[in-house]
Every structure is written in structure tokens, then in C-alpha cells.
Amino acid sequence: MTEYKRVFVDTAPLIYLLEQNLSYYDRLEKAFSSWYESGTEVITSAITVEEYCVFPYRENRMDLIENFESFLEGFGVDVFAIDEEIAKKAAWIRGQYPSLKAMDSIQVAVAEQKNCDCFLTNDKQLRQYSSLNCMIVDEMT
């Protein structure tokens, strides 16, 4: 696996990993283990927290939220808040790439502001933002 210094993780890969999705779990577990062992910094944003927690709150599954929080803490995932600078960067990104959704543009803005050298997602549409090195879960081996 390619060595990265800082990886941004989008919401879907975390859902796949934590729910042990049969199609994706093995490759994600391998990637996260490699990053952990090599000291790669893994980050995400408050958007991921919001997106992940919708289903557990809807279904009153506090165990899933506890598992999510334990994973973030145990793995040392840094969760970054959305501030005015990130909001403006996200607006600029949406202005340049109108097909990107607001949440996606915020995720991209956080990754860019935090100087991530990899963006782990399963959203191939994010590749259109060419200054971002997207790693697509479907294409991982």
C-alpha cells in the first residue's frame, strides 16, 4: 500500500468498516491497519460524524454511536470542525464544480485545508476535483 502522511476518510468507508460490510471490510481493515502501523495521520470532519450518526439515532442504536466514538478515539482519528475558512473554501469548490453536493465540497475543503495527500471515499464523482488524490474503495485491492 502506498505510504501517505495524512489521509482524509469520507463517511462511506467508515460505515463499511464499522458495519463490517462484506464487500469492503477486508480491504479497509488492511488499509487502516497499514496506516496505523506506519503512523499515518487519519482525519475526517464533523460532517462525517453527522452523516454516520443519522441511522443510529433514527433506530435508537446508541451501541453503534458508542462503537463509532470508540473507533475514532482508539484509532486516533482527528475530527475537524467546520469553520468560516472551510465554509468559504467549500463554496469556492462548489462554484467551480457545480455538480458536487454541499457536504462533499465541505469534506474536500477540510481535506485540502489539512493538507491530506489521500482522500478515501467511494464517490467516484469526487475525482473531478483534480487537486485531490482520491482513493476509491471499490478500486482498492
Predicted regions and their residues:
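Short, well-structured N-terminal submotif of metal-dependent ribonuclease cores
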Residues: 1-44, 57-66, 70, 124, ...
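Acidic, PIN/NYN-like endoribonuclease modules and their adjacent C-terminal/linker elements
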Residues: 1-6, 34, 108, 112-141
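Conserved beta-strand segments of alpha/beta enzyme cores
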Residues: 41, 78, 133-135
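Structured helix-beta-strand junction loops
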Residues: 37-39, 74-75, 96
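Short, flexible helix/strand-to-coil boundary loops that buttress conserved ligand/catalytic motifs
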Residues: 18, 56, 94, 130
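A generic structural signal for short hydrophobic patches within well-formed alpha-helices
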Residues: 14, 49, 87, 126-127
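Active-site neighborhoods of divalent-metal-dependent phosphate/nucleic-acid chemistry enzymes
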Residues: 2, 78-120, 124
